[in-house]
């Protein structure tokens, strides 16, 4: 997905269990950022794109950077590693979904909200 410069749409409940948004894909870095302090600028590329999408790093703990790879984080190293596995699995499922049904539409907002809130909402009750 990062190499295609596309965000990962929400097609299924596994994705919605982790976030209510498509996994964003920040644009490729400009030449001046690549030539500068590359790692530092990558962080700004991520934060700037989340802001442009109206998202917070607390809402979405994963992002793609165009022509690069996924970046993940969490409350600790274990959560960041877990999120890395999640984004890889979500990416595979989304690709297979599009191959099986090129006209597929993202999930309904009501189902996205239900799956996210039951695990992360104020009255959460479900966790695997």
Q: Model features per residue range: what roles?
A:
Residues 1-128:
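Glycine-rich flexible loops
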């Amino acid at each position: 997905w990062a190499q295609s410069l596309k965000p990962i749409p929400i097609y299924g409940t596994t994705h919605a269990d982790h976030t209510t948004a498509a996994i964003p894909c920040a644009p490729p870095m400009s030449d001046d950022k690549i030539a500068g302090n590359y790692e530092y600028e990558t962080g700004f590329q991520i934060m700037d794109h989340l802001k442009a999408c109206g998202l917070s790093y607390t809402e979405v703990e994963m992002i793609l950077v165009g022509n690069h790879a996924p970046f993940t984080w969490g409350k600790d190293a274990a959560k960041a590693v877990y999120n890395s596995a999640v984004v890889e699995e979500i990416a595979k499922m989304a690709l297979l979904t599009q191959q099986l049904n090129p006209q597929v539409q993202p999930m309904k907002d009501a189902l996205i909200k239900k799956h996210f809130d039951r695990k992360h909402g104020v009255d959460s009750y479900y966790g695997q």
